[in-house]
Amino acid sequence: MARRNAASPQMGLDLAPAAAAVQRLCGVDEAGRGPLAGPVYAAAVILDPKRPIRGLADSKILTAAKREQLYEKICERALGWHIAFATVEEIDTLNILHASMLAMQRAVQGLAASGIVPDLVQVDGNRCPRVPFPVEAIVQGDALVKAISAASILAKVARDRELRVLHERYPQYGFDSHVGYGTPQHLAALAEFGATPHHRRSFAPVREALARLPMFTAMPATAEVIEPVATVSVTAAQ
């Protein structure tokens, strides 16, 4: 059963309104805390009860194809949504936890800036970003709360798309398969080529690679230089 984790640190207003009074429940989740490369993404979603979406679940248990299908449905049917991120530089400066909080804060603020203001924000996990709305953390919320499930899907798909773009620029690293996580393939590429500017220098395997080899910055001659797909956060029209 979903519950508020009252003992966890709360960074926002944690006085949740009565459930019956909530008209616009905003689900928030992040994607990409663990990888060695790429931004950390977050999404905020307010679902439309008049336009239900079947199949919403924690993005981690869905196939890539199913996530893509649901991504399009969420963007089309949700009352409002916003995707944001924190950069690799922000991750290295703030640490991954605080960068994740920043990405989630940006997602909620972006949604509210569109004119779709939440009555209550529910965040997956045991910590909340600082936002000017009632907010609560829901442990395993991505599996328990449909709006959080939707947010997890948007964040995951958006981040995976950016890592596939990064693969076009640095195919040696295999970003299209591991999307930045520390797989044996990725660690082997770090050992052979060193780290790129898109790697998180504050993460131990990247620090170790930089201690052995200079930064790998050259673009592959055969790859087209493509701008990242998520340089600007996006919000649904009302």
Curated annotation (Swiss-Prot):
Domain RNase H type-2: 23-215
MF GO annotations: manganese ion binding; RNA binding; RNA-DNA hybrid ribonuclease activity
Catalytic activity: Endonucleolytic cleavage to 5'-phosphomonoester
Compartments in which it is found: Cytoplasm
InterPro entries referenced in this protein's UniProt entry, alphabetically: RNase_HII (IPR022898), RNase_HII/HIII (IPR001352), RNase_HII/HIII_dom (IPR024567), RNaseH-like_sf (IPR012337), RNaseH_sf (IPR036397)
Enzyme Commission number(s): 3.1.26.4
Disulfide bond sites: none
Binding site for a divalent metal cation: D29, E30, D124
Entry annotated with the keyword Manganese: yes
CC per GO annotation: cytoplasm; ribonuclease H2 complex
Keywords: Cytoplasm, Endonuclease, Hydrolase, Manganese, Metal-binding, Nuclease
Cofactor: Mn(2+); Mg(2+)
Manner of cofactor binding, per the entry note: Manganese or magnesium. Binds 1 divalent metal ion per monomer in the absence of substrate. May bind a second metal ion after substrate binding.
GO biological process: DNA replication, removal of RNA primer; mismatch repair
Broad enzyme group: hydrolase
NCBIfam families: PRK00015.1-3, PRK00015.1-4
Xref: PANTHER family: RIBONUCLEASE H2 SUBUNIT A, RIBONUCLEASE HII
Family listed: Belongs to the RNase HII family.
Known function: Endonuclease that specifically degrades the RNA of RNA-DNA hybrids.
Protein name per Swiss-Prot or TrEMBL: Ribonuclease HII
UniProt source species: Cupriavidus necator (strain ATCC 17699 / DSM 428 / KCTC 22496 / NCIMB 10442 / H16 / Stanier 337) (Ralstonia eutropha)
